[in-house]
């Protein structure tokens, strides 16, 4: 008996270490704000968006002009005043894209930047969802541990009653042993719930950009809401505006524009050059300076090996992205419907357990104790009622946890915190 009590004290101390009552309480919205600002994955995605934006301007820029400085037709003796065609020359050459390949390349890079931006939004909502799940897991694991402690107190009361009746010769040893066994089993549950809370807190701390040991806050009750009855509004918004779909649409545009740009490069750009030659006097006679101008263009002799092959590659990538878009649309639709149905079922389960089952079972426990004190029933009936109440309280906490998980996953699908009573933090799009 003493070993059971000492193990209970150790478990209670561990629970108090996991949920420090003196710490500042952390609510879910504060946790999400910290995820938005300090999560390292989001910092990486913001840098990728910035890199994609920086690639837009170079994609459509003209090539830099080439300047030439030199000497033409110089005799081997190195003199500039012997031959009329000897001259010092300065020239400039510029490639001029006249058929729009650069413009198409710039638009393709812009579409790639849009895809990265939508990917950043999607990463934010996914991490918000993961943080909500971790927060709910940590909170409800703590609630389960507290429920175990409360049930342990009831078991201690049962053990005392059973032992007192047994010592007086009016009880059975079986009742004492069953109560002590249940008391020990509660310690096993308590250890499991405490481990679950620690793991969930570690996940939440990592998502918030903290070290695991740094999350010493107590947790406020997470928001509880009932999902809408009709999933049509959710599904309509998902199909229209979900960042995953916007990213894939932008990828389709990117590859289609890149294919057009590759084909447009077959159309010859102009290479324009101008040069000016300075001549020295010959035998005291001044020589006129000379200038030259040329226009050249590319002959697409090997276009099949380069530009057209690149265009075909981009066409294939565009088709692949279109297929990915269709698959993502179907996947999001089924996820939205499935999660909505699960959340509705969880919501009904929570209402039923909280409003009817648990309250009725508590009255049953009180009635069984009254009947036991009046001598109308034995202690085993009290034990059964108390154990049933503990099981229903655990089921209620698990149902609330499942509801929070499904709503968190719906948040990643809908990107709408207002459906769940949350004001989502503004998405940070750059580090500056």
Stretches found by the model and what they are:
Residues 3, 10, 26, 124-241, ...:
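Periplasmic alpha-helical coiled-coil/stalk elements that build and connect Gram-negative outer-membrane
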Residues 22-71, 86, 95-98, 104, ...:
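Bacterial Sec-pathway N-terminal export signals of envelope proteins
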Residues 18-20:
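N-terminal signal peptide c-region/cleavage motif recognized by signal peptidases
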Residues 27, 65-123, 244-258, 263-328, ...:
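Small/polar-residue-enriched beta-strand and adjacent coil segments characteristic
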Residues 44-56, 123, 127-148, 157-159, ...:
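Amphipathic alpha-helical coiled-coil segments
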Residues 106-110, 173-181, 312, 379-387:
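Short, charged, amphipathic alpha-helical segments
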Residues 24-137, 144-149, 155-159, 170-173, ...:
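Short flexible linkers and secondary-structure junctions
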Residues 8-16:
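Sec-dependent N-terminal signal peptides
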């Amino acid at each position: 008996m003493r070993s059971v009590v000492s193990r209970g004290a150790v478990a209670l101390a561990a629970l108090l270490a996991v949920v420090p009552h003196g710490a500042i309480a952390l609510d879910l919205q504060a946790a999400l704000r910290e995820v938005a600002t300090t999560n390292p994955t989001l910092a990486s995605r913001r840098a990728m968006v910035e890199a994609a934006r920086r690639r837009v301007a170079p994609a459509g820029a003209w090539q830099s002009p080439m300047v030439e400085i030199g000497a033409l037709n110089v005799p081997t003796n190195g003199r500039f005043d012997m031959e009329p065609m000897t001259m010092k020359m300065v020239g400039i050459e510029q490639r001029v894209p006249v058929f729009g390949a650069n413009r198409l390349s710039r638009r393709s890079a812009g579409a790639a930047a849009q895809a990265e931006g939508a990917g950043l939004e999607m990463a934010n909502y996914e991490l918000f969802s993961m943080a909500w799940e971790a927060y709910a897991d940590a909170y409800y694991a703590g609630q389960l541990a507290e429920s175990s402690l409360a049930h342990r107190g009831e078991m201690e009361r049962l053990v005392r009653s059973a032992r007192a009746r047994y010592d007086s010769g009016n009880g059975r040893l079986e009742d004492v042993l069953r109560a002590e066994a249940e008391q020990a089993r509660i310690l096993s549950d308590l250890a499991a719930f405490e481990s679950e809370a620690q793991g969930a807190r570690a996940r939440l701390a990592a998502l918030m950009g903290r070290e695991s040991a740094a999350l010493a806050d107590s947790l406020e009750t997470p928001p509880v809401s009932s999902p809408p009855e009709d999933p049509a509004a959710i599904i309509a918004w998902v199909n229209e505006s979900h960042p995953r779909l916007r990213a894939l649409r932008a990828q389709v545009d990117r590859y289609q524009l890149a294919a057009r740009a590759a084909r447009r490069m077959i159309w010859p750009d102009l290479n324009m050059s101008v040069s000016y030659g300075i001549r020295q006097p010959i035998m005291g006679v001044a020589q006129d300076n000379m200038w030259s101008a040329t226009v050249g263009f590319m002959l697409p002799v090997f276009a099949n090996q380069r530009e057209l092959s690149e265009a075909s590659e981009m066409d294939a990538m565009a088709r692949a992205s279109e297929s990915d878009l269709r698959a993502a649309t179907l996947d999001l639709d089924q996820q939205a419907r499935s999660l909505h149905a699960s959340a509705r079922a969880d919501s009904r389960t929570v209402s039923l357990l909280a409003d009817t089952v648990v309250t009725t079972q508590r009255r049953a426990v009180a009635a069984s104790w009254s009947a036991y004190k009046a001598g109308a029933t034995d202690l085993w009936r009290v034990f059964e009622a108390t154990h049933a109440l503990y099981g229903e309280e655990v089921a209620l906490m698990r149902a609330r946890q499942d509801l929070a998980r499904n709503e968190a996953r719906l948040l990643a699908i809908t990107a709408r915190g207002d459906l769940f009573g949350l004001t989502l933090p503004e998405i940070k799009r750059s580090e500056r």
